Design a protein with these regions (language model features):
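Outer-membrane beta-barrel architecture
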Residues: 118-124, 153, 162-164, 192, ...
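Outer membrane beta-barrel
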Residues: 110-253, 284-291, 374, 407, ...
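Bacterial N-terminal signal peptides
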Residues: 7-16
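Detector for outer-membrane/organellar transmembrane beta-barrel domains
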Residues: 281-403, 411, 452, 456, ...
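N-terminal periplasmic/intermembrane-space "pro-region" immediately following the signal or transit peptide
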Residues: 22-128, 466
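Predominantly the C-terminal beta-signal and adjacent terminal strand-loop region
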Residues: 420-466
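Solvent-exposed loop segments that connect transmembrane elements
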Residues: 140, 253-274, 309-311, 343-365, ...
């Protein structure tokens, strides 16, 4: 191997580094591949340096001969650029090769860009413990409740270039599930897009409740719901916010999966209905009241289809909501009304008055049509008691009036307080319910044996967020 071959290899190596830098600037998923290229290039450089030492020992006078004047018509600046880009030259042409110092500088630059991309994403998470005592569970009463690990979660948020990223994965005791995962882009100061699994824009956002247990609307799928599609957030000025969204399906296309965070229609047994092709429109007016605070009032519309796997036919579903969300000093007041309806195309013999929904690994039946009313009140506190720096006390009330045959009203009320202490956030909730799922009921809106009975649950959730 002569010096001509050596400098050509160094030139090709320099061109590969240039290509890697250009490619790294374009796509984030290639960072791992680029790091591998860096390691390969470093190995080649070490080998070439060893060979160079051998050649120098064999050369007379210790100096290498200068390259001859190129005679090929491809010579000159254009050809040198081609060599730098990694193109192969004729054996008779010996372009200027990058020095080891220059190559090290290119590698260092590439690693810096990769580190910048990695540091643009911020990682966090939470570990939560939960204590529960239930008066409708004899075992729970005999044990005086149960205390266990409730959740471990990891989330990532940040920006890479002009693209926003946000994702969260959760592990519960009996299942794991995606919470959300989307990429976003701001077209301008007014319009932002989220593509992926995002929060459905419906009713009071981000939550129509204050406690850990959420409001009754959560268990109907109308609070903190996440589906897969595209959402646009439009803020033409400080007085208005609009949402426009299309969701192809829930966060999981597998409708038989009960292990999920959001409540959706799920399939099982003779209930084979699933959600598809959903449109959402939401508008909210922000009012500033002198001497009092702020008042947000809004309207929401949700329209979609219900696909039945048995009949292969599509039914309709819709929901409309009006809401008010007021913040007067340390007080927050929420008022919301919802009307919803599912019109499934079931086979003969399957009751159309109830549909099967589910999450947290449990399916249940809910009334296919009804009105929902929420009245919530909370007060925030700033305190200085050891590590405790703040908190709130609240009462969240939900009344569900089904509009189908053989049904009964469902009620849920949550009274509690939350405490903030550094990275620790704790909820202390007393939940009471009648004919309400997850509070001793057989479902929501069902006229079952437990319909007229009030049930209670004490729930304490302590989470460390990092």
């Amino acid at each position: 191997m002569n010096r001509l071959h050596l400098v050509l290899l160094l030139g090709l190596l320099g061109g590969a580094a240039g290509q890697a830098i250009a490619q790294e600037r374009e796509t984030d998923p290639e960072i791992r591949e680029l790091r591998q290229q860096i390691e390969a290039m470093q190995a080649q450089l070490d080998s070439l340096q060893t060979r160079l030492s051998e050649i120098q020992q064999q050369s007379t006078g210790g100096d290498a001969a200068e390259p001859s004047e190129p005679s090929d018509p491809r010579s000159g600046p254009e050809y040198a650029a081609a060599i730098d880009a990694g193109d192969e030259a004729d054996d008779g042409v010996e372009p200027q090769a990058p020095t080891p110092a220059q190559l090290d500088q290119r590698i260092s630059s590439l690693e810096t860009v990769a580190d910048d991309w990695t540091s643009a994403i911020r990682f966090g998470g939470a570990v939560r413990l939960n204590y529960a005592w239930r008066d409708y569970d004899e075992g729970s009463k005999d044990r005086v409740g149960d205390f266990e690990l409730e959740l471990f979660r990891i989330n990532a948020d940040g920006e890479v270039g002009d693209v926003k990223l946000s994702a969260e994965w959760r592990r519960y005791n009996d299942f794991h599930a995606i919470h959300h995962a989307w990429v976003g882009y701001e077209f301008n100061d007014e319009i932002e897009m989220h593509l992926g699994i995002s929060q459905v824009p419906f009713g009071i956002l981000p939550f129509a409740s204050h406690g850990f247990w959420f409001g009754g609307t959560y268990y109907l799928g109308f609070e903190d719901d996440y589906d897969t599609g595209v959402k646009f957030i439009h803020k033409p000025n400080e007085d208005w916010t609009f949402h426009y969204a299309f969701y192809k399906n829930p966060e999981y296309a597998d409708d038989s999966r009960f292990g999920r965070y959001s409540f959706d229609l799920v399939t099982g047994g003779d209930q084979q209905n699933s959600e598809t092709n959903q449109f959402n429109l939401r508008g909210e007016r922000h009012l500033f009241i002198d001497g009092l605070g702020t008042l947000d009032v809004g309207l929401s519309l949700q329209q979609g289809r219900v696909f039945n796997d048995f009949t292969q036919r599509k039914g309709d579903r819709y929901a409309v909501a009006g809401h008010a969300d007021a913040n007067f000093g340390r007080w927050n007041f929420q008022l919301q009304g919802i009307r919803y309806e599912f019109d499934p195309q079931n086979p003969v013999g399957v009751d159309d008055d109830f549909v099967q929904t589910g999450a947290f690994d449990f399916p249940f039946l809910m009334a296919a049509k009804g009105d929902v009313y929420s009245v919530n009140l909370a007060r925030r506190f700033n305190v200085s008691l050891g590590p405790i720096t703040g908190g709130a006390c609240y009462n969240d009330f939900t009344f569900i009036n089904p509009k189908v045959r053989d049904s009964a009203d469902s009620i849920q009320n949550v009274t509690g307080c939350s405490i903030i202490a550094g990275g620790v956030f704790a909820y202390f909730d007393w939940i009471t319910g009648k004919n309400m799922w997850f509070v001793g009921g057989d479902g929501i809106g069902r006229n079952a044996t437990t319909a007229g009975k009030w049930r209670s649950r004490l729930n304490v959730n302590i989470g460390f967020y990092f």
